[in-house]
Amino acid sequence: MSDRHLSPLLSALTALLLPCLTATAQTGIAIDHDFGDWNPAGDLATADTVGPLVAAGFATDAENLYFHLVYDRLVALDESWEPHGTRLGVDIDGNTSTGQIVGGFQGADIVVHLQDRYVSESNTNGTTEQHSLNDRYVRMAPTYGGEEHEVSLGRAVNGVPVAGTVRWTVRCGSGQQVSGEVALDNTPALAMATPLERAEGAEVRVAFWNMNRRLDEAPALEAMGRILQAVQPDVIGMSEVEDFSAAHVRDLLDGWLPLEGGSWHVAKDDWDLMVCSRWPITTEYPDIYRQFPVLVDAPWAGDLMVAASHLKCCNGAEQRRTEADEYMAFLRDAMTEGGDVDLPSKTPVVYGGDLNMVGPGWAMQTLLTGNIHDEVANGPDFAPDWDGTALRELTCLQSDRAMDYTWRNDNSSWGAGKLDYILVQDGVVKVLREFSLETSSMTAERRTQYGLEPGDDLQASDHYIVVADLKKRDRRPGTKPVQLKKAN
């Protein structure tokens, strides 16, 4: 598991020990809930300890302005269950007599109201216009609650000049504020061009995808087919497929990804989940609410358990935590002798899907660590990896953009966010490649290479497919992974 879940205030403490008068410019930043690309020494600490804001940093590259935000409590930037009232202000013309006032900062031409989910921009005539976060390419991570966050703001769409300096500020509703000034950096944004082919040595490629109930819409089906032909998964966990039969999905997959001498294996639970596999599905466990584990006869020594998930949406943090508790009780039973399910030792388990992880993120902590909330109903805590550690949350950065969001609706007030996840037991599998796919951010050459169209991502669904290549760590000596024939 990433250290970001273990020490969220490390950079804040460093910032408090190393105060400076202005932020140090830096580049090479990904919006991915991994803060290792931020220099804590460049953060500015707030002058008081009232909270919630502890420190903030700022950086630029040729595409974006970036903010690094550190709090003393769990905060979700675009939600108000923990009120924070964070505003980000940027002065792009260097004129303090124009623009908006943000606390003690004058001249903000752009003000991002994170909690209220809009951007206010000043016009030359003294008026302001309101835009959505999506209109102004505001991206942030994590999507759920955390003590540390990062935000990007598109330069071109917001009229940020190509040269000069910008003044910036971060202010919380309770009055904490830090401000600075930096020279604009035109270093290219972090380059991404992840190969869509499976990684060398990969034995299983797993994917998870919310199909948005579009499996009977011709334009969506065409886009889905192109994406799946480009990605070539072995096992797919699907959600929002309640209106379709397993036979319908099997026929689609047989057309998109034909198997030599056979058909796809498709298992459906009692609600909206399916697991589809090139190899036989030997056992199904459909009784776990909004989660569907199955056993797959994988090409390595022993089985593979894949659990497709679609946790409660929106304001359902308590229910998501209950659902996570129920699944982890199942996994604990499966990994220990006795009870209803007994997996052979070191059987890899992969969990993923649309987790709807917004709000405090309690469910994610349960899923990663095995820290069960309601132990009376679901039993004791346990270590969910066979090596006695926590699970690993895969970043699944987009193949062609250094962003981790997997859901996007440009007409929504909610900003793009990461809702789709893959969690693995990295004590028993190696992750050789991982990505999500936003076709609109690919170059024309890359799309041509893989037979994709610019709008395939949102034509297929409002969620992006997430993909991981896995290799079992303890495959028997002398055995070789099955080589799959690529479909035309």
Where are these regions (language model features)?
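Bacterial N-terminal signal peptides
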Residues: 11-20
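Active-site-proximal beta-strand/loop segments in catalytic clefts of secreted hydrolases
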Residues: 70-72, 208-213, 238-242, 264-272, ...
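N-terminal, active-site-proximal structural segment of metallo-dependent hydrolase catalytic domains
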Residues: 178-256, 268-273, 303-304, 319-325, ...
